[in-house]
Amino acid sequence: MKRPDYRTLQALDAVIRERGFERAAQKLCITQSAVSQRIKQLENMFGQPLLVRTVPPRPTEQGQKLLALLRQVELLEEEWLGDEQTGSTPLLLSLAVNADSLATWLLPALSAVLADSPIRLNLQVEDETRTQERLRRGEVVGAVSIQPQALPSCLVDQLGALDYLFVGSKAFADRYFPNGVTRAALLKAPAVAFDHLDDMHQAFLQQNFDLPPGSVPCHIVNSSEAFVQLARQGTTCCMIPHLQIEKELKSGELIDLTPGLYQRRMLYWHRFAPESRMMRNVTDALLAYGHKVLRQD
């Protein structure tokens, strides 16, 4: 049975994290040649490449499995070594989260854990349809995802749902929808997406107004908070979580343009098994807060 030296695994991890051999060497305080030798040693052990030498480098499927193993070992070490030793060096906790969860419920959910535990968060923001892939690749130890099925050697629990409303300012509605939200009017109304893979707005319009993808003008903005600002200032109509704009809806600063119509995204918490003590604390905090503020029906 092949048992990798975790020092060599850390070299592989550093190349991926630092996006190259030179910065990985600086991070590990060794030469670039030493980094290459350690990775070559791993590849010889497993008889196959562990890195695709692109810019930046990316792990092969076997490399992903080894990185996932390293993440589990790092967390389990925290539990076995005890508080006295781990308290001096905060544990790095890498999580993949969607921007809307980060902008609404995730940080309050983790506030007590962060206050009571020696943790350094590394939050990697990704669309909720793709966060699970980061867990699969071993880049993170936990992920908030819309995927209900657990990966091999992982655990999953339902958190609850975010309900997305189609909203805009009153001025925007008066300008683009003077006769209500119609198929013809939507073709001229500017929209916004998080990135080129974000299809929520398009899916909502296709489902409810039979508009094909790509038929409406759409800005690309990688910020959940910017969606709210764009809607408030009358620049676009947006799909925004109800949880994020409760005050704006109550004050009338934003209005629900299609009352009774919404998009629901059920969220799930994925992490490696077995869980370390620290990860159990994180899991308990996320589930408790998620069940409190997210839709459960």
Curated annotation (Swiss-Prot):
SUPFAM superfamilies cross-referenced by the UniProt entry: Periplasmic binding protein-like II, Winged helix' DNA-binding domain
Pfam families in the record: HTH_1, LysR_substrate
Residue ranges: DNA binding: 21-40
GO molecular function: DNA binding; DNA-binding transcription factor activity
Subunit structure comment from the entry: Homodimer.
Purpose of the protein: Controls the transcription of genes involved in arginine and lysine metabolism.
Name of the featured protein: HTH-type transcriptional regulator ArgP
